[in-house]
Swiss-Prot record:
It comes from Methanocaldococcus jannaschii (strain ATCC 43067 / DSM 2661 / JAL-1 / JCM 10045 / NBRC 100440). SUPFAM superfamilies: DsrEFH-like (SSF75169), SirA-like (SSF64307). This is Uncharacterized protein MJ0760. It comes from the Archaea.
Length: 275
């Protein structure tokens, strides 16, 4: 029987569901990652998957099919651990595992982004992320190894805006969100990270208290940026120092930690801007 992850292409096939049906009959458990031509092939595949009542995800032209229950080689629970605890605990566990083995991670919401971003940056493959419905999440990760990239000219297409001053410097606070808006207009993808005193901007209602006569209320700029899909992270350690948690966190903001921060800084296509 075929187990774990199998990737294949069905481009050019008139009825890709026929091939997938044959593969499913020889698959006990695991994930099938299918690269398609597009909408028509995806519709053909979806009919088959609904017939078998199988869970699946569509990401662009790729269909990821879940078959059975994937069994992990090891499990670790990091619920309650604060940054950088979760990623260090998981990294230690992975260091004792072989490439290709599966680790099941149970974590809280605060460490979810850190773990998925950090683990991908280390060369591992995130197989599945599942909301358990009780405030915890289940991550299945396949151990891999980071491949050395050859030096090449990389186009800068992302901006990583880091604010460390928060409400203590209104000028830099305004600049943080205005710069993100300008980046969007220049076809750059902006991401905002609030750390140290910058974390004060993440306290619910705090941005609405900042207003300069020449500009709109800071809170309005923040909501506008969020509505355009810009991610705003706040450092978990800085948030904890200032008593900021999920209960008083500004809507739309996400708590993240060192792995997320370092993963962005390590991307060759990202230009960091410190404020």
């Amino acid at each position: 029987m075929i187990r774990m992850i199998r990737k294949f292409k069905v481009k050019g096939l008139r009825s890709p569901s026929l091939l997938i049906d044959m593969i499913l009959n020889d698959t006990e458990e695991g994930i099938l990652v299918v690269e398609t031509d597009g909408e028509e092939q995806i519709k053909d595949i979806e009919k088959l998957l609904k017939k078998y009542n199988l869970k699946y995800e569509v990401d662009g032209n790729v269909v990821k099919i879940y078959v059975g229950e994937i069994k992990a080689d090891k499990t670790i629970n990091v619920v309650g651990a604060t940054c950088p605890g979760p990623i260090m605990m998981v990294s230690d566990m992975l260091s004792k595992m072989k490439n290709g083995e599966i680790l099941e991670i149970i974590c809280g919401k605060n460490s979810l982004t850190d773990l998925t971003e950090g683990l991908k940056g280390m060369g591992n493959e995130i197989i599945k992320v599942e909301d358990k419905g009780d405030g915890t999440y289940r991550i299945l990760v396949k151990k891999g190894e980071k491949k050395e990239e050859k030096a090449a000219v990389t186009k800068i297409d992302e901006l990583f805006i880091i604010n460390t001053t928060g409400t203590g410097n209104a000028e830099k606070a305004y600049a943080t969100f205005m710069m993100a808006d300008v980046a969007l207009k220049m076809n750059l993808k902006p991401t905002i990270f609030l750390m140290m005193d910058g974390a004060s901007l993440a306290l619910k209602g705090e941005c609405d208290r900042v207003k300069h006569p020449a500009f709109p209320k800071l809170g309005d700029l923040v909501r506008d940026i969020l509505s355009k899909g810009v991610k705003i992270y706040v450092c978990e350690l800085s948030a904890e120092f200032r008593g900021i948690n999920e209960k008083n966190l500004e809507e739309g903001f996400e708590i993240a930690g060192a792995p997320t921060f370092l993963n962005y800084l390590s991307k060759p296509n990202v230009r960091p801007v410190w404020l």
